[in-house]
């Protein structure tokens, strides 16, 4: 869009090493390059798809280090959210499609580091998450879901610039606000005909909506709550 003051961003970001997009693209790239390199020499200047800056956590690009790959992905995700925040305006929300998976929840129903990483990047950039909705984005009969009680394929995160960019609150204040809003929010979700299997992940929404109003929620000793 030529006018960045009216820029709308809706994105389905990469998820650690789940899909190697650039590697998959090589299959098509070599054939396209053969046909089009003389027409678009700048776009087809390399033998294969460039991969150095691809935002995925693939250890083989970091001498086999899973930790280095993880840090590259998380730092890159934070940088992306920060850049989006520079252009975001109040009346147009940012929407992010997060592919919430069965293994994103542990045995106690707690979210995994993948979920935490995404939320941290969004909040640190200065966004507040004002809405979360589960969305079925895969065919019900796909092979990985047959015979399972599969979660909704994605959660749509609706984000807006936080009104007070550096505001903080205490853990006590956060819990008080959460308690006052959670019951009505859950009732609204139940009235929306959300499938029971999706309710646990949907219930995360009201909580992170309150949490993301602040740049940090502080413990009694002044340290950030995680």
Each model region followed by its residue ranges:
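S-adenosyl-L-methionine-dependent nucleic acid methyltransferase catalytic domains
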Residues: 1-226
